[in-house]
Amino acid sequence: MSYNRRSKNITQGVARSPNRSMYYALGYQKEDFDKPMIGIANGHSTITPCNAGLQRLSDAAVAAVKDAGANPQIFGTPTISDGMSMGTEGMKYSLVSREVIADCIETCVQGQWMDGVVVVGGCDKNMPGGMIALARINVPGIYVYGGTIRPGHWKGHDLTIVSSFEAVGEFTAGRMSQEDFEGVEKNACPTTGSCGGMYTANTMSSSFEALGMSLLYSSTMANPDQEKADSAAESARVLVEAVKKDLKPRDIITKQSIENAVSVIMATGGSTNAVLHYLAIAHAAEIDWSIEDFERIRKRVPVICDLKPSGQYVATDLHAAGGIPQVMKLLLDAGLLHGGCMTITGRTLAEELKDVPSVPRADQKVIHPIDQALYKEGHLAILKGNLAEDGAVAKITGLKNPVITGPARVFDDEQSALAAILDDRIRAGDVVVLRYLGPQGGPGMPEMLAPTSAIIGKGLGESVGLITDGRFSGGTWGMVVGHVAPEAFVGGTIALVQEGDSITIDAHKLLLQLNVDDAELARRRAAWKQPAPRYTRGVLAKYAALARPANQGAVTG
């Protein structure tokens, strides 16, 4: 039986003789035209350590595809480094790159009539970009995550990239020596791999195991380890079998499997960015999903993993403790996962987890039993109020002061806010407002890790609030609220805030409120004028023109 269901459109018949001529130039033989064509979407790049170790994984996938009797076709996908672009204009390209990656994969797979695709990625937007593409084109596919970085070490402390960001605030506050500042800088990132806490890359890759689109245990492996390359090869073999079975992404990505993915995100204390990305993935798969669904799941799924940024441990510790399968087994036994969901292996999630212990190992402290959860409810909350009629996203667990009412300190760009924090112009009790940074206004919803880390480094993490229509890094923690919708650029209430206005952030009531009377707000709204777009040409201008609101995933189509 032939499994080249799609690629035969480009390789078979008299009219395709010129096509075959070009394939012969690539080393193909006549018998190869009856084999399935498998794309390898290779995200390798020396831009960032997150992607610098992907070539080895792509090579392993290529070899496995050949061994499985199929033809590998390698093409590149772009990336930017969120960590390196953070705090600069370059960060505006981060979320945009999610759309570019999705479009890139769609273009290559559809343009070349590939029968399946192995997506290999590392940095934050690689994961949602790849999954959006798979859900959109609905061609058999699997996600191979590049793997996590190992933790750095300095004077007995484990480090991640967030340690470096927070060191900036500590050093400028005089709370860290020059020696320690440089020590953290040089030792925070000791290997290739994605940022090591339960930040955005590890959040999304972990959730892909629960979604059914990645192999078990693959999300918490360290990039340099041999098991990571072995997992990439096994992923490619599984994908070829999925092509033979005609098992497609939309057979796997369903509303129930997305609920599984979000449940794992809640249980592991994952990134706020997951809210945005799963809205986008669901949209690509044509599944009815909203921010209210996140709140519904938050109320029933506890946080059971003690992971950075708000906890103690990193992804390699989670891997040693049993990985995401151990987390999922606890959730499944508690009735918090849909075990009947199909996975890329052709087996259900419950079947995949059959041999995973029902009790986590006693010699580890990363994964807690359900009845000993760190928090009884999830951490990613949807806040609403007159400052966010369409919703905003916050991490609410672990806050010593879950309610703050204070004067607004208003900034229309990130650099001005960062300078004010580092110059000690932000004081305990203030609420920093960063606006005109939404999908259209930023454009691209840049992440605010630099100012939030500076606040923490200054020792103000529990006493200063920050709200924005932009995003936060997965490494952010504290009294911070992002994804405010409607955004300032379209006239959302956040655009009407004035310096010194009273703002309340209430994590208990899930409230984000500007304490200004309706008549005054109406006066300000009548006087407000939409600013000119920051960009009128290029990819940022294209994105700004097409982007939907944050509460719809900030998608472009």
Swiss-Prot record:
GO molecular function list: 2 iron, 2 sulfur cluster binding; dihydroxy-acid dehydratase activity; magnesium ion binding
The protein's assembly and partners: Homodimer.
Binding-site residues for [2Fe-2S] cluster, renumbered to this chain: C50, C123, C195
UniProt keywords, alphabetically: 2Fe-2S, Amino-acid biosynthesis, Branched-chain amino acid biosynthesis, Iron, Iron-sulfur, Lyase, Magnesium, Metal-binding
Reaction equation(s) it catalyzes: (2R)-2,3-dihydroxy-3-methylbutanoate = 3-methyl-2-oxobutanoate + H2O; (2R,3R)-2,3-dihydroxy-3-methylpentanoate = (S)-3-methyl-2-oxopentanoate + H2O
Residue positions binding Mg(2+): D82, D124, K125, E447
Sites of N6-carboxylysine modification: K125
Active site: S473 (proton acceptor)
Gene name, Swiss-Prot/TrEMBL: ilvD
Cofactor(s) listed in the protein's UniProt record: [2Fe-2S] cluster; Mg(2+)
Function of the molecule: Functions in the biosynthesis of branched-chain amino acids. Catalyzes the dehydration of (2R,3R)-2,3-dihydroxy-3-methylpentanoate (2,3-dihydroxy-3-methylvalerate) into 2-oxo-3-methylpentanoate (2-oxo-3-methylvalerate) and of (2R)-2,3-dihydroxy-3-methylbutanoate (2,3-dihydroxyisovalerate) into 2-oxo-3-methylbutanoate (2-oxoisovalerate), the penultimate precursor to L-isoleucine and L-valine, respectively.
The name this protein goes by in its record: Dihydroxy-acid dehydratase
UniProt similarity note: Belongs to the IlvD/Edd family.
